[in-house]
Amino acid sequence: MPTIHWLGTGLSAIPGLKKLIENGHSVIVYNRTVDKAIEALSGVDGDYQVVPFSIEAVKKYASAGDLVVSMLPGNFHVPVAELCISLDAHFVSSSYISDEMRDLNSAAIKKGLCLVNEVGLDPGIDHSMSHALVQEYRNSSVFSKENSHSFLSYCGGLSDIPNDFCYKFSWSPLGVLKIGRASCRERV
């Protein structure tokens, strides 16, 4: 089974990462601060290891057919995707497709590789967990087609400290400003 290489353990990364590990996937977790990644995964049982993040570390551990998931700031995505292409590994991120990322598409296609971006809402991969919650409800003993529910996601945090954006900056402020110009609707 291919290894999943998970880059970054920020606030939006942990639920999806835990789900992969708990479902039996082999994962190498890369983080700038190893102790923070270990703390974030405390109590999680499964096949994973934590190593310091660097492009060189990903190059050392990733192999052909592996999957690299980048939850890093957007400026890392293109260099990581380029590395993935050179290693014959697949790449996934939650970020919007930049022109530089779009330019990598033909090289990936020629090698039969997937470069998957814009997974779900930005910050993306974490929000796929909402689909898992809906599915758990549908499979539960309390599910009924007659029930009516709503689900609202703000894709971030409401700030305890008032600011002009009414937003808690827990990820890239530039990313927050860019996402503010886009709209998204999801029907679950």
In which residue ranges do the predicted regions lie?
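Hydrophobic/small residue at the entry helix of a nucleotide-binding pocket
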Residues: 11-13
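Rossmann-fold cofactor-recognition segment
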Residues: 44-55
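Conserved N-terminal Rossmann-fold NAD(P)-binding element of oxidoreductases
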Residues: 4-9
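ADP-ribose/adenylate-binding Rossmann-like module
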Residues: 83-101
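Rossmann-fold NAD(P)-binding glycine/threonine-rich loop
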Residues: 95-117
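Rossmann-like dinucleotide-binding core of oxidoreductases
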Residues: 113-187
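NAD(P)-binding Rossmann-fold cofactor-contacting core
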Residues: 27-41
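N-terminal Rossmann-like NAD(P) cofactor-binding module of classical short-chain dehydrogenase/reductase
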Residues: 66-71, 91-93
